[in-house]
A protein has these predicted regions:
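Sec/Tat signal peptide C-region and signal peptidase I cleavage site
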Residues: 19-24
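Bacterial N-terminal signal peptides
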Residues: 9-18
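A residue-level marker of the well-folded mature domains of exported/periplasmic proteins
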Residues: 25-261
Length: 261
């Protein structure tokens, strides 16, 4: 599945160059985003990657995206509409799109679907991810070295495989650097809600955490950490500009090579 865009784009180019052939139509690729791309976080990283795909393949592909697509029933409607509009490849970039995409994939057997971070597949629906947990491991090492209270706060989104991957990798790195450190986890049950994220960060700091880790999308935890003089990390993109006095490091997700290759 990772090679599909490149293969189809090259096929289109070959058709276009053959003698007497009509100019090939571009490969249409659609992306579903949970939030607006903005300038930070998970969706922003995917939007940068979409732009990389468009720049890399030029007029051989036509990429579009739909933003602010909530997880659940409405996602099914949007996925179905993208398929009806002639998109030959559709990427769903949030975990909650998994079941809606699987359902729609059965009705459009000639369309290729790929669900990011999921685990359910069909004949024309694949899953994909990047090794973000390697960055979490490094975060764990740094957090274990920087904490003075030996208490590290971790704001997790939902109890799903992706979240546990990151949490476990972080814990391994932290314990290697500091066997005495402990993780205090709050499940925010959101991907991006500044109020909930800030409340979670403050609760963890009230309990003695002097490093705040987030697997949520807004800069609210970093800002809360800076306000109270503790360390924090960014999620999915460089967030250092939001809280330069508190920012330790960020896991920066670079999806471009994944989508292109």
């Amino acid at each position: 599945m990772k090679k599909f865009i490149k293969m189809m784009a090259l096929t289109a180019a070959a058709i276009g160059m053959s003698a007497g052939a009509a100019v090939a139509e571009p490969l249409k690729v659609g992306f579903l985003y949970l939030t607006t791309p903005g300038d930070h976080g998970w969706t922003y990283a995917h939007e940068l990657a979409r732009q990389e795909v468009q720049a890399h393949f030029g007029d051989k592909v036509e990429t579009t995206f739909v933003e602010n697509v909530p997880e659940g029933p409405d996602a099914e409607r949007v996925v179905r509409e993208l398929a009806r509009q002639g998109n030959q490849v559709i990427f769903g970039t949030s975990f909650g799109y998994m079941d809606p995409m699987l359902k729609v994939s059965k009705d459009f057997p000639d369309v290729k679907f790929e669900h990011i971070t999921g685990y359910k597949r069909s004949g024309n629906m694949a899953t994909g991810n990047i090794r973000f947990y390697e960055g979490r491991y490094v975060q764990g090492i740094v957090a274990g070295m920087m904490t003075k209270t030996n208490k590290i706060g971790y704001i997790a989104p939902f109890p799903i495989p992706e979240a546990y991957q990151g949490l476990n990798a972080f814990a391994i790195g932290m314990r290697e650097a500091n066997p005495n450190a402990e993780i205090m986890v709050i499940w925010a049950n959101t991907w991006a809600d500044p109020v909930k994220e800030a409340d979670a960060a403050n609760t963890l700091m009230d309990q003695g955490a002097d490093v705040i880790i987030q697997h949520t999308d807004s800069p609210a935890p970093l800002l809360a950490a800076q306000k109270r003089g503790v360390w924090g990390v960014g999620q999915a993109s460089d967030m250092s500009h939001f809280a330069p006095e508190a920012h330790l490091l960020s896991v920066v997700n670079h999806w471009g090579p994944y989508y292109i290759d």
